[in-house]
Amino acid sequence: MIKNIRITQTRSSIGCLPKHKATLAGLGLRRIGHAVERQDNPVIQGMINLISYMVKVEKQ
């Protein structure tokens, strides 16, 4: 069974590194409070680790 995680953006991308903005875009997050569901895999986990200070993660 594929596990999903829910990722919610909690902080603004204003003033952060361009690499972090690109990671948010790669996850599909556009604004504060926006949430997306993604499959739980090593690629997504690496992206979350990079911007962990900007997002909240919930296991589904």
Curated annotation (Swiss-Prot):
Task: Please indicate which superkingdom the organism of origin belongs to.
Answer: Bacteria
* GO terms under cellular component: large ribosomal subunit
Write out the GO biological process terms.
Answer: translation
User: Which regions span the lipid bilayer?
Assistant: none
Keywords (A to Z) from UniProt: Ribonucleoprotein, Ribosomal protein
Q: Which GO terms describe its molecular function?
A: structural constituent of ribosome
State the InterPro entries in the record: Ribo_uL30_ferredoxin-like_sf, Ribosomal_uL30_bac-type, Ribosomal_uL30_CS, Ribosomal_uL30_ferredoxin-like
Keyword Hydrolase assigned to the entry: answer is no
Annotated signal sequence range: none
Q: Which Pfam families match?
A: Ribosomal_L30
Family of this protein: Belongs to the universal ribosomal protein uL30 family.
- Describe its partners and assembly state: Part of the 50S ribosomal subunit.
Q: Would you tell me the protein name for this molecule?
A: Large ribosomal subunit protein uL30
Species of the source:
Baumannia cicadellinicola subsp. Homalodisca coagulata
